[in-house]
């Protein structure tokens, strides 16, 4: 189980990313449309003035049951060992067990 503070930090980042998503997208479009380099720098400065945690690259995918940040499967939103336990318990329809 991940620490609660890390999970809350990740939720805070998700909220910031959603809040600034359209602002960042519009600034990026402006940068691509402006031909002069000085204007691009000014717009880039505006983009940099937004909070760091509003950038989508800073988001980290976590297991929604345990909060584990590694070995996550996008299709299920679960970490590897939780996914394996659920498949062995027949809780995921359509998934087959594998043992080696």
Curated annotation (Swiss-Prot):
UniProt main location, coarse: plastid
Keywords: Chloroplast, Plastid, Ribonucleoprotein, Ribosomal protein, RNA-binding, rRNA-binding
Record's keyword annotation contains rRNA-binding: yes
InterPro entries per UniProt: Ribosomal_uS14, Ribosomal_uS14_bac/plastid, Ribosomal_uS14_CS
Top-rank taxon, per record: Eukaryota
A Gene Ontology molecular function term of the record: structural constituent of ribosome
One example of a Gene Ontology biological process annotation: translation
Localization terms from the record: Plastid, Chloroplast
Any one cellular-component term (Gene Ontology): chloroplast
Family: Belongs to the universal ribosomal protein uS14 family.
Function according to Swiss-Prot or TrEMBL: Binds 16S rRNA, required for the assembly of 30S particles.
Subunit structure: Part of the 30S ribosomal subunit.
HAMAP family recorded: Ribosomal_uS14_1
This protein's name: Small ribosomal subunit protein uS14c
Chain's gene name: rps14
């Amino acid at each position: 189980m991940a620490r609660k503070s890390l999970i809350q930090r990740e939720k805070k980042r998700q909220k910031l990313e959603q809040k600034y998503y359209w602002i960042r997208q519009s600034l990026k479009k402006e940068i691509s449309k402006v031909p002069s380099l000085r204007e691009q720098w000014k717009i880039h400065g505006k983009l940099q003035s937004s909070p760091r945690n509003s950038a989508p690259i800073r988001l980290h995918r976590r297991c929604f049951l345990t909060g584990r940040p590694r070995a996550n499967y996008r299709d299920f939103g679960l970490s590897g060992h939780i996914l394996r336990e659920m498949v062995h318990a027949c809780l995921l329809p359509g998934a087959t067990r594998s043992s080696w």
